[in-house]
Amino acid sequence: MIGVIGRYDGDIIKVPSNLIKIINYYGKTPIIIAPTKSYDEVFDKRKIDKILKNLVGIIIPGGTIWSSIDSYVVRYAIENDISMLCICLGCQLLSICDSQIVKDNLEKNCSAIEHNSKNKYAHSIFINEDSLLYKIIKKKEIEVNSRHNYHINNKFGRIDAYSSDGYIEALEIENKKFILGVQFHPEDLYDDINMRKIFDYFFESCE
């Protein structure tokens, strides 16, 4: 089973449909972990633990704001070495999961490159050769989409990739089966071989 954090939006819990399709494609069962509030929710950790201990992988999707459940799940995955893919907002959370810094302290977009674009491909990223992302894709430069409003300026974890304007585009937690954060949205570029490789590697690590 693969856990996916839902995004609270009033009376609706949203989950990207492309992620559900991809999880099903790889023969896994998606388990939605649904917050009931958008940020400072108080929740029963014992109930969440019962869900998390049965998961082989976790996906932290993009969104506009995370909940306290997000923070708990990210730390749980790191501490228990559960494979985890953190996308956009999830990547931003991964970058500060060793602190109590909130989203407002992340850096707003302020560069010449369009980091919040509706284009299929928004810009290039440059991948460090000694990184997990390079091990997966085996390329030093690829094109990605981009829809994030915040840059990463904290350096928790190993930096895997940058944009040409110097902002962090991917990071990993070392010495784990698979914990990778990306600022782009691979689920929306699944027809791109580079994005498929990310999911291939993630789901292989979940076996």
Predicted feature locations:
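Conserved hydrolase catalytic core segment
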Residues: I101-V102
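A glycine-rich beta-turn/hairpin centered on an aromatic-Pro dipeptide
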Residues: N145-N153
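Active-site-proximal beta-strand elements of phosphoester/diester hydrolases
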Residues: L180-F184
